[in-house]
Amino acid sequence: MTFGRGGAASVVLNVGGARYSLSRELLKDFPLRRVSRLHGCRSERDVLEVCDDYDRERNEYFFDRHSEAFGFILLYVRGHGKLRFAPRMCELSFYNEMIYWGLEGAHLEYCCQRRLDDRMSDTHTFHAADELGREQPRPAGPEAAPSRRWLERMRRTFEEPTSSLAAQILASVSVVFVIVSMVVLCASTLPDWRAAVADNRSLDDRSRYSASPGREPSGIIEAICIGWFTAECIVRFIVSKNKCEFVKRPLNIIDLLAITPYYISVLMTVFTGENSQLQRAGVTLRVLRMMRIFWVIKLARHFIGLQTLGLTLKRCYREMAMLLVFICVAMAIFSALSQLLEHGLDLETSNKDFASIPAACWWVIISMTTVGYGDMYPITVPGRILGGVCVVSGIVLLALPITFIYHSFVQCYHELKFRSARYSRSLSAEFLN
């Protein structure tokens, strides 16, 4: 067929059931490359390379594409507004439609370009983690297959709490150890607990008892928990595919930070036998033992909510930095003004609580976050007016990035939940084979 020489004066484009009539002259210089290519087609074979089907009698070209997306694209190329995403349509799907018709990402409005970049970045990260979790090195020979399969099952049992019944039991036991260790840590700081422990030992053995934390009931429980965490960490390191990647993971670094202080404190008590040396090391020992609080972060391995929180903070670091800048700027302004109004003017009602700007910063941050301890407050009329403005400003500033953080949290939650469900299905099918 030859366009522009005889025949019908117009052609019909049928895109997903929606029909559009175009003149031949308009078709020749049409902004969409795929549509304009129809003008140069000389045979039906050339036409079918451009569209999905062709009706010679009605001179109609069929495209099995998204009709609503093409409608938005057609409005854009005709000069009616700017190109934005179609409602209720995935950004990546709309972008694929743009590529099909011959447009690029640069044709999108800036806000839509940012949405597309964020979605492509998230999808790339998601698929990279997916491929990393799916890839399995092939065994060298038939004899290596059973051991490789066993190591893979062990790795997934320790890494994926929802992969099997054994993984769920192991995760439950680990959670119990974390909870027990946290309860013992909190109880060991109670005055009644320490008094009861001191009454059960003799005065002569008190120094040796203090130097050996394993002799206390709480020390015994701590040693058992540390033993479990250490064994779990070692096994997970042995069965991991990539040892370097294992060491770099944030949760594994937290495990190391939670376990190492115990062994350091044990070594310090062994090498500081004299009481004077022990007293000098007492503060260090208490700090190291208090680092057991990091164990609570181990729960992130077993609870999707904590994983969602960490992933949200990672993706929203720009919004968090913006929030921090807002707070710092407002705190600098309000602290300087409050110090001037309450103390710097040397009035008879000088407020000593606002003697310096750093002291006023405490009042500003407490007021902006609407906590209001009441330990210090303005007493002058201008200071109270400034306090009201400070509170309202804090509410507004804190609310600005909340929308971005909320949407990111919901997106991260659905991604992690979908990934967990997919692992459960794939692993169940694999273990049944």
UniProtKB/Swiss-Prot annotation:
Query: Which residues are exposed on the Cytoplasmic face of the membrane?
Result: 1-165, 240-250, 303-317, 414-433
What GO biological process term is on the record, naming one? protein homooligomerization
Query: Has UniProt tagged this entry with the keyword Transmembrane?
Result: yes
Membrane-spanning residues where? 166-187, 218-239, 251-271, 282-302, 318-339, 385-413
| Residues on Extracellular side | 188-217, 272-281, 340-357, 378-384
Intramembrane: 358-369, 370-377
The record's section on InterPro entries has:
BTB/POZ_dom, Ion_trans_dom, K_chnl_volt-dep_Kv, K_chnl_volt-dep_Kv5/Kv9, SKP1/BTB/POZ_sf, T1-type_BTB, VG_K_chnl, Volt_channel_dom_sf
CDD domains named among the record's database cross-references: BTB_POZ_KCNG3
> What GO molecular function terms would the record report?
potassium channel regulator activity; voltage-gated potassium channel activity
Q: What is its main location?
A: membrane
What GO CC terms are in its UniProt record?
endoplasmic reticulum; plasma membrane; voltage-gated potassium channel complex
Note the topology in the membrane: Multi-pass membrane protein
Q: Where in the cell is it found?
A: Cell membrane; Cytoplasm
Q: Indicate which residues form the motif Selectivity filter.
A: 370-375
Keyword Membrane included in the entry's annotation = yes
- What is said about the domains? The transmembrane segment S4 functions as a voltage-sensor and is characterized by a series of positively charged amino acids at every third position. Channel opening and closing is effected by a conformation change that affects the position and orientation of the voltage-sensor paddle formed by S3 and S4 within the membrane. A transmembrane electric field that is positive inside would push the positively charged S4 segment outwards, thereby opening the pore, while a field that is negative inside would pull the S4 segment inwards and close the pore.
State the family it belongs to: Belongs to the potassium channel family. G (TC 1.A.1.2) subfamily. Kv6.3/KCNG3 sub-subfamily.
Query: Which PANTHER family would you find in this protein's record?
Result: POTASSIUM VOLTAGE-GATED CHANNEL SUBFAMILY G MEMBER 3, VOLTAGE-GATED POTASSIUM CHANNEL
Q: How does it assemble?
A: Heterotetramer with KCNB1. Does not form homomultimers.
This molecule's function is given as: Regulatory subunit of the voltage-gated potassium (Kv) channel which, when coassembled with KCNB1, modulates the kinetics parameters of the heterotetrameric channel namely the inactivation and deactivation rate. Potassium channel subunit that does not form functional channels by itself. Reduces the deactivation rate. Moderately acceleratee activation.
The protein's name: Voltage-gated potassium channel regulatory subunit KCNG3
Q: List the taxonomic lineage.
A: Eukaryota, Metazoa, Chordata, Craniata, Vertebrata
